[in-house]
From Swiss-Prot, chain B:
Family that this chain belongs to: Belongs to the TRAPP small subunits family. Sedlin subfamily.
Gene symbol of the encoding locus: TRAPPC2L
Protein's recorded name: Trafficking protein particle complex subunit 2-like protein
InterPro entries on file: Longin-like_dom_sf, Sedlin, TRAPPC2L
Gene3D superfamilies the UniProt entry points to: 3.30.450.70
GO cellular component: endoplasmic reticulum; Golgi apparatus; perinuclear region of cytoplasm
Alphabetized SUPFAM superfamilies for the sequence: SNARE-like
Subcellular location per the Swiss-Prot or TrEMBL entry: Cytoplasm, Perinuclear region; Endoplasmic reticulum; Golgi apparatus
């Protein structure tokens, strides 16, 4: 349906627009990724509030991560996370073999160096969602071969 | 019809407190503050099965001689506390639940407002209107 394409196109335009503005201005390129991530953070906070409105209380951290992998990912990207790994000590790796924001770009190694820009927003999304549920974390992403990508979540114990 | 409604952030500071007979406001603030302890107790009662662990609605927190206090915790650890007049016995559990549902829906709408920073006090007029509709009419 057209509504899937809407978010993909808006997101690509967001990334392109931010980098265009950075080129014209004086700012360094590193700030664009931070801006994208903080945008994703705020969106993630609001989204999580809406999605967890009707779900039951979460038992523990693993429960929350499973919710993110299944319900949250399905609602935003229309599919689930393909693989969740953890070392049970606060590190989770979410693997998506066909990340929707990257499928339109390439199916191998082409454009690999541009991929991180398109993952920043989603990293922020995960971090914002977790923070609203009471978990402080650091989320990073890596791509070895499009369109598969891995999100690594490191829980910060205060 | 509630007498006082409070929204408390996960760090336990108030985001929104409104009470109807405005001269005794401090007493209601104190009541809400002490009810936070009871809320924490109920949430952390793991394995005791006193409260259904999967539900967001906590039920009656504690009754005083004039008032009854009800609680509700969202998944993002934001607490809603409602103080109801004891003399108003017509209020059933279902009505209280539906009032908390409305509160939760309005709070979700506020979160999605781009002009609202999570953690700030709530100044939304739509939220005020909704809370007014739930408070007792004092003439």
């Amino acid at each position: 349906m057209a509504d899937e394409a809407l978010f993909l196109l808006l997101h690509s335009e967001m990334v392109a627009g931010l980098y265009r503005a950075a080129e014209q201005g004086e700012g360094e390129n590193g700030r664009c990724t931070t801006k994208l991530e903080s945008m994703g953070f705020r969106v993630g906070q609001g989204l999580i509030e809406r999605f967890t409105k009707d779900t039951a209380r979460f038992k523990d951290e693993l429960d929350i991560m499973k919710f993110i992998c299944k319900d949250f990912w399905t609602t935003v990207f229309k599919k689930q996370i393909d693989n969740l790994r953890t070392n049970h000590q606060g590190i989770y790796v979410l693997q998506d073999n066909k990340f929707r924001l990257l499928t339109q770009m390439s199916a191998g190694k082409q454009y690999l160096e541009h991929a991180p820009k398109y993952l920043a927003f989603t990293c922020g999304l995960i971090r914002g969602g977790l923070s609203n549920l009471g978990i402080k974390s650091i989320v990073t992403a890596e791509v070895s071969s499009m369109p598969a990508c891995k999100f690594q979540v490191m829980i910060q114990k205060i | 019809m509630a007498v006082c409604i409070a929204v408390i952030a996960k760090e336990n500071y108030p985001l929104y407190i409104r009470s109807v007979p405005t001269e005794n406001e401090l007493k209601f603030h104190y009541t809400v503050h002490t009810s936070l302890d009871v809320v924490d107790e109920k949430i952390s009662a793991m394995g005791k099965a006193l409260v259904d662990q999967r539900e967001l609605y906590l039920g009656l927190l504690y009754p005083t001689e004039d008032y009854k206090v009800y609680g509700y915790v969202t998944n993002s650890k934001v607490k809603f506390v409602m103080v109801v007049d004891s003399s108003n016995t017509a209020l059933r559990d279902n009505e209280i639940r539906s009032m908390f549902r409305k509160l939760h829906n309005s709070y979700t709408d506020i979160m999605c407002n781009p002009f609202y920073n999570p953690g700030d006090r709530i100044h939304s007029r739509a939220f005020d209107t909704m809370v007014n509709s739930m408070m007792m009419q004092v003439c």
